[in-house]
């Protein structure tokens, strides 16, 4: 009789991937990154185990926003004080913190649990073409 194999974090084979975000729509990029971080691309996917791979995203400042979202998309956050609702457009956010656009999009697609926070720590986003994970020899992935 066949038994279902239970994947444990010790048996998970984590790989490193490199994705170039230049001229790639933000939604397509972030769905691919979120799926890879969760491990949904693996045939042994288990929702309660961190089995996702590590992802390095380069050229985040050149990610593509369609339909005038640069001016119209607004990101909100609250300081915690009365009247402390702050807002920033995608264009201003791209100028201040270019990697934050990709990080916010991917974070919203991961589970909002302790496991999701752990998976999010496997994401490394860089504004330019240089990154610090050369020693891991990440494999390049093309976004369609």
Swiss-Prot record:
InterPro entries: Ribosomal_uL13, Ribosomal_uL13_bac-type, Ribosomal_uL13_CS, Ribosomal_uL13_sf. Signal peptide: none annotated. Coiled coil: none annotated. One of its GO terms (molecular function) is mRNA binding. GO terms for biological process: negative regulation of translation; translation. Gene3D superfamilies: Ribosomal protein L13. One of its GO terms (cellular component) is cytosolic large ribosomal subunit. Keywords: Ribonucleoprotein, Ribosomal protein. It comes from the Bacteria. SUPFAM superfamilies: Ribosomal protein L13. Belongs to the universal ribosomal protein uL13 family. Part of the 50S ribosomal subunit. HAMAP family: Ribosomal_uL13. NCBIfam families: rplM_bact. This protein is one of the early assembly proteins of the 50S ribosomal subunit, although it is not seen to bind rRNA by itself. It is important during the early stages of 50S assembly. This is Large ribosomal subunit protein uL13. It comes from Metamycoplasma arthritidis (strain 158L3-1). The lineage of its organism: Bacteria, Bacillati, Mycoplasmatota, Mycoplasmoidales, Metamycoplasmataceae.
